[in-house]
A protein has these predicted regions:
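Active-site-adjacent beta->alpha loops and helix N-cap segments on the catalytic face
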Residues: 1-2, 163
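Short, structured active-site "lid" loops
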Residues: 4-8
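Residue-level "edge-of-site" marker
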Residues: 13-14, 51, 94, 186
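Conserved radical SAM core fold
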Residues: 14-19, 52-56, 152-156
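Active-site acidic/histidine proton-transfer and metal-coordination neighborhood
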Residues: 20-120, 130-132
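Histidine-acidic metal/acid-base catalytic patches
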Residues: 42-43, 101-123, 127-188
Length: 188
């Protein structure tokens, strides 16, 4: 990767037993270990569903307690990441996968609540296609914290064969002079 001028970003979702909303101390331990491993391979960031996992759904908006627990866990994780020279990203995912964080704006609000300069928003066009009012607006909303994007079609298939408006996305990225990472995430 280095020879090709590419950067390494590791991505994960927390296992159920350490979802930050329910077990912040477990999440902190898990994320610290993951950050140590990311640093060991020379990654620049750890990102993904670092606040929870796929299947964490209550059918209700997140509670104050859940958000406080997530904030506590990510404050500690961001502090550890900083000691390693790493960035920590937050990927909002759709409501069918979690009730905690579904939009880019919610990720911005969480990052601003935490106040860690080494945290960033990680958008995913698959999830944006489900949750956002428009891809361009989501990109504009997150612009001050946006550093990484998963490019994925609406059906996780071949780009251009689904309903994602790629032109809208790339026009918005040009409008904010996006300099972050783009990763293709396709299940073909």
């Amino acid at each position: 990767l280095e020879a090709a001028g590419m950067r390494t970003v590791c991505s994960l979702g927390l296992p159920e037993k350490v979802w930050a909303s329910q077990n912040p101390d477990g999440a902190i331990a898990f994320l610290k270990l993951a950050l140590d491993k990311a640093a060991a391979i020379g990654a620049e960031a750890l990102s993904g569903v670092v606040y929870g996992g796929i299947g964490e759904r209550s059918g209700l908006p997140p509670t104050k307690s859940e958000l406080d627990n997530v904030t506590h866990a990510l404050e500690a994780a961001a502090a550890h990441a900083k000691t390693l020279g790493l960035l920590l990203g937050i990927e909002p995912v759709n409501r069918y996968e979690t009730h905690l964080l579904n939009t880019g704006w919610q990720a911005v609000e969480l990052i601003e609540r935490i106040g860690a300069e080494n945290m960033f928003v990680h958008l995913d066009t698959y999830h944006m296609n489900i949750e956002e009012k428009g891809a361009a607006q989501a990109i504009l909303d997150a612009r001050d914290h946006l550093r990484y994007i998963h490019l994925s079609e609406s059906d996780r298939g071949t780009p251009g064969m689904g309903t994602v408006d790629w032109e809208e996305i790339f026009v918005a990225l040009r409008a904010i002079d996006f300099q972050g990472g783009l990763a293709m995430e396709s299940f073909v």
